[in-house]
């Protein structure tokens, strides 16, 4: 089995190392990820400048490939250039920060990378871990983040995908892990309508010219309450006639995941 691991937090993220460790016993792994932080740009692809690839050594001493472009570029280059054949699974993550709701479907790079793999017929899994503050992802390596549960679940779900494939009608999975779950039960959910209320912060540069920070605060929303108690495994909504069928197939697939664990 061959597993391609990528992310949008960058090749030096602690989360991508945790992802590799979680699945290294399941098959041959290769990390191909963007050289720099690419969060929030969705399914972006580099079209108007060359994309360069460098071999790098991660902080745990393992090797990886750093791509000068986006996570989407990394998936394409990994599948069609760096690997001899298509991988059996692509894992995107482990992302610092949850990816919930329909808005995240179009803005999340973690989901975008998994989606790109699915476009090319490769089963994929996006994994995101809730963190205390949204800015933690920008201080990776300086703030301790406990990936243990997210890594354990990544390995469990990845093993299920490799053994049984994805459920009928499902192209990829999006797994969200709360920072302090009430249990390790995995629940199937639907995508919510919105994740956060948008806040725009206006500031002035030294020359008096305005600039803006776009921010979101999930505190107090149903997403925050939901993520604080249970693990979430969900899929983007397929076209309406097939939505219930895919949900049923995923629920049955999850039952097999629980039986396999026991």
Swiss-Prot record:
Organism from which the protein derives: Methanothermobacter thermautotrophicus (strain ATCC 29096 / DSM 1053 / JCM 10044 / NBRC 100330 / Delta H) (Methanobacterium thermoautotrophicum)
MF annotations from Gene Ontology: 5'-nucleotidase activity; metal ion binding; nucleotide binding
Protein name: 5'-nucleotidase SurE
Cofactor: a divalent metal cation
Broad class of enzyme this protein falls into: hydrolase
InterPro entries: SurE, SurE-like_Pase/nucleotidase, SurE-like_sf
Annotated cofactor note: Binds 1 divalent metal cation per subunit.
EC number: 3.1.3.5
Catalysed reactions listed for this entry: a ribonucleoside 5'-phosphate + H2O = a ribonucleoside + phosphate
Signal peptide: none
Chief location category: cytoplasm
NCBIfam families named in the record: PRK00346.2-1, surE
Alphabetic keyword roster: Cytoplasm, Hydrolase, Metal-binding, Nucleotide-binding
Subcellular location: Cytoplasm
Keyword presence, Transmembrane: no
Record keyword Zinc present: no
Highest taxon in the source lineage: Archaea
Family as reported in the entry's similarity comment: Belongs to the SurE nucleotidase family.
Residues noted as binding a divalent metal cation in the record, renumbered to the chain: 8-9, 39, 95
């Amino acid at each position: 089995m061959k597993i391609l691991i990528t992310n949008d937090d960058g090749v030096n993220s602690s989360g991508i190392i945790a992802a590799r460790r979680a699945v290294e016993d399941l098959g041959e792994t290769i990390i191909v990820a963007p050289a720099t932080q690419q969060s929030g740009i969705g399914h972006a692809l580099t079209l108007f400048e060359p994309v360069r690839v460098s071999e790098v050594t991660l902080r745990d001493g393992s090797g990886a490939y750093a791509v000068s472009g986006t996570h989407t570029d990394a998936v394409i280059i990994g599948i069609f250039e760096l690997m001899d054949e298509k991988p059996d699974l692509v894992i995107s993550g482990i992302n610092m920060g949850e990816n919930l709701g329909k808005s995240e479907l179009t803005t999340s790079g973690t989901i975008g990378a998994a989606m790109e793999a699915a476009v090319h017929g490769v089963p994929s899994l996006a994994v995101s871990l809730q963190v205390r503050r949204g800015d933690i992802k920008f201080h990776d390596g300086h703030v301790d983040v406990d990936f243990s549960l997210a890594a354990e679940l990544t390995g469990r779900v990845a093993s299920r995908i490799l053994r049984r494939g994805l459920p009928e009608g499902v192209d990829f999975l999006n797994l969200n892990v709360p920072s302090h779950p009430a249990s390790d039960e995995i629940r199937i959910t639907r995508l919510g309508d919105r994740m956060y209320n948008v806040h725009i912060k206006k500031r002035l540069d030294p020359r008096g010219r305005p600039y803006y920070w776009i921010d979101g605060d999930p505190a107090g929303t149903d997403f925050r309450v939901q993520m604080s108690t249970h693990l979430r495994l969900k899929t983007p909504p397929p076209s309406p006639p097939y939505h219930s069928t895919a949900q049923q197939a995923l629920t049955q697939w999850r039952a097999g995941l629980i039986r396999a664990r026991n």
